[in-house]
C-alpha cells in the first residue's frame, strides 16, 4: 500500500487535524503488496484525461460512483487509482463513517455521512487510511 500512502501523503501535505482512536474497530481491507505498481499505474493513466480541477458537489451513484473522468480534485486520482484495483473508497469510507462518524473530521457541520462527497475530502481519506493502518 506504499504507493497509496505516497499518493495520500502528497495530498495531505497541507492538511492537518487531530485524529482520535477508533470507537469501532475498522474493517480489514486486503490490498496485496504486488498491486502497488498497478495502483500507481492507475494514477498515471489519468494523466491527460483528468483535465479540469472541479471540486463541485455532485450526486453520485453508490457504490462505485465517480465524477466525470475529465474532472475532479486530487482525491479523485487516488479514488480512481484504487478503484482500478477493485478497491472502492467511496463504499469503504462511507461504511466506516456510518459506524464511526465522530471519529472523522467535523469541518463541514454535517450530522451524518454523505456518500456523494465524504470519500472525496482529503481529511476523511487521511482518517480512513490511518484508521485502517494503510
Where would I find each of the regions flagged by the language model?
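...with weaker cross-activation on analogous glycine-rich loops/strands in unrelated enzymes
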Residues: 35-40, 98-134
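N-terminal Sec signal peptide cleavage junction
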Residues: 14-19
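Short N-terminal segments immediately surrounding and downstream of signal-peptide cleavage
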Residues: 21-43
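Acidic helix-start/capping segments at beta-turn-to-alpha-helix junctions
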Residues: 54-75, 88-112
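Bacterial N-terminal signal peptides
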Residues: 4-13
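Sec-exported extracytoplasmic/periplasmic mature domains
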Residues: 44, 48-51, 79-87, 94, ...
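Solvent-exposed, acidic/flexible segments
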Residues: 32-36, 40, 50-51, 64-75, ...
